Swiss-Prot record:
Residues the record lists as binding substrate: Y110
Organism per entry: Clostridium beijerinckii (strain ATCC 51743 / NCIMB 8052)
Protein's name in the database: tRNA pseudouridine synthase A
Enzyme Commission (EC) number: 5.4.99.12
Role played: Formation of pseudouridine at positions 38, 39 and 40 in the anticodon stem and loop of transfer RNAs.
Length: 244
């Protein structure tokens, strides 16, 4: 069996997330269907992340095992010609048998985009979160420092996960601002369920003055989900890169 690695870009607006479901359109399902059409093999692909409905990716990584004779770098074209317009294989290559898109990963970078103006945005609204009240970006930047490092992030996780540990290491968290566009970048060795979206919601709570920067330390130590911010909508979230 050969092991093929894919780098995938997708617009998650019209998907029910990455993971195959009995009902609903998923990224995993459309790619597996395209591979079946290209090779005649019913395979299961492993994704680096299980993104939720509405979340996008610039560089999702996946891998699958195949007996096909298609050269590794030619799978890109073979699959792309059978995919819908909102999913694209950016690169394909044959890798070692022990590579696994999820379990071999050392970390990921996500971005989240906020448009901070009173008027809602009509163009490109599916890729950002509209927040109409003024945000103090300098205070939000100060708050970023409290998240960096190895902590128990259970206060920033939505219920419904069965993971064994809620401790993660955030390597970097910073904010770029261009006019009324605020873009938050976060890199970590792993993420809890909705962790990025809740951290962004907490930064918004700092930015609108409803939470003090110094309270972040207490929220992390107490692990109290109710004291953290809201879970912002998925559409502003993009998986930017996966590290190996």
């Amino acid at each position: 069996m050969r092991n093929i690695k894919l780098i995938i870009e997708f617009d998650g607006s019209n998907f029910c997330g990455w993971q195959r479901q009995p009902k609903g359109r998923t990224i995993q399902k459309v790619i597996e269907t395209a591979i079946f059409k290209a090779t005649g093999e019913e395979i299961m692909i492993n994704g680096s992340s299980r993104t939720d409905a509405g979340v996008h990716a610039r560089e999702m990584v996946a891998n699958f095992l195949t007996n096909s004779s298609i050269p590794g770098d030619k799978f890109r074209e073979a699959i792309n010609t059978r995919l819908p317009e909102d999913v694209s294989i950016i690169k394909s290559e044959e890798v070692s048998e022990d590579f696994h898109a999820r379990y071999s990963s050392k970390g990921k970078t996500y971005s989240y985009t906020i448009i901070n103006r009173y008027e809602r945005l009509s163009l490109g609204h599916q890729y950002l979160y509209h927040y109409k009240y003024r945000l103090d970006v300098n205070e939000m930047r100060r708050a970023c420092e409290y998240f960096i490092g190895r902590h128990d992030f259970r206060a920033f996780m939505s219920p419904g996960s069965s993971i064994k540990t809620t401790t993660r290491t955030i390597h970097d968290l910073y904010i770029d601002q261009n006019g009324n566009e605020i873009k938050i970048f976060i890199t970590a060795d792993g993420f809890l369920y909705n962790m990025v979206r809740i951290i962004v919601g907490t930064l918004i709570k700092i930015g609108n003055g409803k939470l003090e920067v110094e309270n972040i330390k207490d929220i992390i130590e107490e692990g109290n989900r109710k004291k953290a911010g809201m879970c912002v909508p998925p559409n502003g979230l993009i998986l930017e890169k996966v590290f190996y």
